[in-house]
Amino acid sequence: IVDAYLKGIGNFDPEKALEACVATANLDNYRGIGAYKELGYVPFNEKDSYNAENWSLSKTLEYAYDDYCIARMAEKLGKKEIADEFYKRSQNYRNVYNPATSFMQPRDDKGEFQKDFKADAYTPHICESNGWQYFWSVQHDIDGLIGLTGGKERFAQKLDSMFTFHPSADDELPLFSTGMIGQYAHGNEPSHHVIYLYNAVDQPWKTQEYVAKVMNELYLNSPAGLCGNEDCGQMSAWYVFSAMGFYPVNPISGQYEIGTPLFPEVQLHLDNGKTFTVKAPAVSKENIYIRSTKLNGKPYDKSYITHEQIMSGATLEFEMGKEKVTSDQ
């Protein structure tokens, strides 16, 4: 709803839509929302008739993002009081971060973190994922998450561990943990934005490496071409965005993080009559690294492009190569 409103898509009453969003976010007897509002998180020992699955940790993180979306819409509509309330609520992700383990962790209604927590375990407190996969679900405040983790260097190390800490041969993974690269599960949507977070710590070549790996190895022209459940079209949406060379880590931000393109040229013919073009003439399975970028013929050094740039009919050009370009080059 908020993404559509901010992009001017859809014929609906934004005031009524905001009213519905706020009402839904304040259903105190539904899926732990009352406790979330009171404590700042959904406790794992919360019981209610709508909370059969538990999923307390993942709910807390998703509610925080939902709150941020409501705040953005309220701010755009000039509803300062609502915006302030929900921006504050959007920081609730901090309440489930345990500095002792450096993971998001379930808490009970007394504030105690779950004992014997294992980040690679699949528990009832996290929806179809584990602690590694849901740690990064703070799409609205990546800088804040980096700060919690201890800065860019520590955050980059944790990302590296995500992709290199492989399940053991004896681990029995659930059905939804497919397309695994370390603890990253491309077959399950909560992981999908994580590859692009290397941009936030000034290591875009790692984003480029992993995006290319996933596109070339986990999407195949065969009956088993998708490595996981298509859930609402997200597996395909990730591929379409990534193949063009960018991806919306935070969908309502209006920004698309740059990855690595798959095709020498892509054109988007827009409803406003303009055409957005992505060019990467030297791209290949070997030439996956972006050596330089131009936007409308001028050097461009940002790690993202914006919705406005796309809709203006801009031309994005990538010089590709087989050698990575690191931050010290």
Where are each of the predicted segments found?
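Surface loops and adjacent helix of pleckstrin homology
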Residues: 281, 298, 321
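Active-site core of glycosidic bond-cleaving carbohydrate-active enzymes
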Residues: 8-91, 95-277, 282, 308, ...
